[in-house]
Amino acid sequence: MTKKLHIKTWGCQMNEYDSSKMADLLNSTHGYTLTEQAEDADVLLLNTCSIREKAQEKVFALLGRWKKLKESNPDMIIGVGGCVASQEGAQIRQRASCVDIVFGPQTLHRLPEMINSVRGTRSPVVDVSFPEIEKFDRMPEPRADGPTAFVSIMEGCNKYCTFCVVPYTRGEEVSRPSDDILFEVAQLAAQGVREVNLLGQNVNAYRGETFDGGICSFAELLRLVAAIDGIDRIRFTTSHPIEFNDDIIDVYRDTPELVSFLHLPVQSGADRILTLMKRAHTALEYKAIIRKLLAARPNIQISSDFIIGFPGETQADFEQTMKLIGEINFDISYSFIYSARPGTPAADLPDDVSEDEKKQRLYILQDRINQQTTAWSRRKLGTVQRILVEGTSRKNVMELSGRTECNRVVNFEGSPEHIGKFVDVEITDVYANSLRGMLLRGEHQMALRTLETPASVIERTRKENELGVATWLP
């Protein structure tokens, strides 16, 4: 009988990536297959996020429902991972004794051993340590799921912004060796992946070791990934303005595979608030980065993050944020009302902005961002956009759906043979959350690179030692 695994994921793209790796790992070691139904699973895993308010309450509410499932199936194993697990540790079991495993973002690779231990001893396991880069060394080979894929290049953050829990839950910055990343990307490309999204809490701080003992910068890594045949689009998430240097901007100038869309969080447009947040840059310095980016890539679109109602934020501070939004002309962006995260420096500041004021400011900001986002979408009307076709449309299975460089969903009529490939589409309609277009040409009519397949690169460089363990020679 097939063993089933159910994973519930909350939070950022890094959590989504981690969950996919958990599924791959447990499939390779224990033969678990994923199920959408928690009641059908032998193992339930909750991958948590602690960024938002009441994160802990949300966790224990779900665990309360899972407890009932375990009462009817005592052999079921329940595990809690992610950032809430890293923060709370063994305290999770004090409130929810049904939990068998508590693991952090840096120990998910130990899940097979943890499950074996629970099965063998019926005793709970708690491991929220920070064994640095070890988790990447013990992951199975990547499995593509469509033409796009996430690839983690680093973990943690050293910036210690006063509102953020990441350094405390994921640890400080640790970069993967560049050759490991390139090999993973080549493996994904060999499986049909055309677009990769490089992941990290602060990707532009990447400093990975090379095969000869040197250090690879983020700008160098971007160019190396772009050189892999089959990879025609590169995105990255997320970056910090303080380390967005000229070398990275130069990549936008000379590497067309890097998309003309950038998510660069600013959080506030008021220097006083940026100082309280310990962001280490001013609004003027942020605008200088954008100015250089536009000089290198005039058609680039910028999205960002904003925190509303940070302790001490005045109406004048908020107006500075609104001014910055207008000056930059941000595209799709994310905004949140400030809520204190336990253990962060900002949690000790007086939360002196009323809830009504926070909500009013959030409404004003989101309304302005929505206006700008709509304007950006309308500019696409009548233009020809290159789309990476991801599959059939969610709303109409007779249509195909894909994304532009600027991350807009485009639906159009076309045959299934285009799935996983690029097409050129003329935009004919603009909607609130998507675009519609007419197919003009398929990939066979484009001049995309076909010099050497990723599979041939892997085969040519793959070596095995006397134990039969495969290695890759750069």
Curated annotation (Swiss-Prot):
CDD domains xrefs: Radical_SAM
GO molecular function, one term: metal ion binding
Subunit: Monomer.
Binding annotation for [4Fe-4S] cluster 2: 157, 161, 164
All copies of domain TRAM, residue ranges: 378-441
MTTase N-terminal domain residues: 3-120
GN (gene name): miaB
Domain Radical SAM core: 143-375
Gene3D superfamilies (alphabetical): Methylthiotransferase, N-terminal domain, tm_1862 like domain
This protein's name: tRNA-2-methylthio-N(6)-dimethylallyladenosine synthase
